Amino acid sequence: IYSFRAADIKNILDFTRDYPEARVYRLEENYRSTEAILRFANAVIVKNALRLARALRPVKRGGEPVRLYRAEDAREEARFVAEEIARLGPPWDRYAVLYRTNAQSRLLEQALAGRGIPARVVGGVGFFERAEVKDLLAYARLALNPLDAVSLKRVLNTPPRGIGPATWARVQLLAQEKGLPPWEALKEAARTFPRAEPLRHFVALVEELQDLVFGPAEAFFRHLLEATDYPAYLREAYPEDAEDRLENVEELLRAAKEAEDLQDFLDRVALTAKAEEPAEAEGRVALMTLHNAKGLEFPVVFLVGVEEGLLPHRNSVSTLEGLEEERRLAYVGITRAKRHA
C-alpha cells in the first residue's frame, strides 16, 4: 500500500525466487479481530491474484457480523456515522473512521461536531486547517472584512503576484506614518507607489470579490479560483500532492454550496473549528486515511466511501496492480477493527 513511496509488492512476491534458501514463516494467528471480522477481510483479499497465500485465523471466536450501510450520498453517510457513534456513546477514543482521501474528512468533522462529539484527524490536520483551504477562507474573510490584517497578509502574494516582503514592509510603514488600517494603506500604495501594478491588480481583485459577498458562497469561491488561477498555482507549487489539494478545493466548493451566503459559510466553519478545540487525543474519535491507519487498532471501525472512484480510487482502477493495491487498503481498514466494523 506504499507504492506512492516507491515500494514494490514484487519485493515480497519474488523473495523466495531471489533468495531460494530462505524459509517462509506465515504469521496467520490473529489476536486482534473477531472471527466475523477476519472472515469478511479474508473474503476481500482472497480476490487478489498478486499475493502470497495466507488466511488469518482468529483467536477470538464468533463476534458480530460486519455491518454494511448504503447511504444516498456522502453527507448522509457522515450523518449515519455520527449518529451511530452518538448512539453507542463514549469513550470516544474507541472509535476510528477510515477513508481513502483526505478531502473526505470534512463532512465527518462537521457531522461529529454537530453532535458535540470530539474528533481529531490523525497523521494530518483538520480539513479547515489545510493550507489551500486556509488560503481560500482568508480571501473570503478579507472580502467580508477588509480590516482583517491577518487574512490580508496571507493572501497578498498567494498565488505569487510580485508583491514581496519588501513591498509589504513599505505598506506597513505607510500605515504607521498615516495612522491607516493596512487595507487602506495598501490602496493608497497602489495609487502612489512607483511600479505598483501588482498592488493595483490585487486591490481590484479584492474589490471584485467584495461585490460577491452577499451572493451564493459557491459562486464567490468559483470566481476567486478563476480570477487567481489558483488550481494552476497548486499544480505548480505542489506537484507531488497537487491532486489531493485540488480534491480539498472541490470539497470546499461542495461545502460552500450548502451555505446561504458567504457569512453563513464562515459561521459554519467557525463552529466546526470550535468543536475541534478540546485537547486530549485520548478522548476523541480518530479520523484518518487508510494509509495512516496501518499498524493501529480500535474496538469500533467505520470504513467510509467504499464506492467506485474513492475506494477503489479512480486513479487505480485501470490496472490490475492498482486495483489490487486498493483491495489491500480495504483489507488494512477492515482488520483495524477489534470488535465491530
Predicted features and spans:
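Conserved helicase NTPase motor core
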Residues: 1-14, 29-33, 224
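Flexible beta-alpha connector loops of hexameric P-loop NTPases
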Residues: 1-5, 25, 69, 317-321
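Conserved helicase C-terminal RecA-like lobe
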Residues: 91, 105-117, 130, 137-341
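Well-ordered alpha-helical segments embedded in enzymatic catalytic cores
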Residues: 11, 77-84, 135, 251, ...
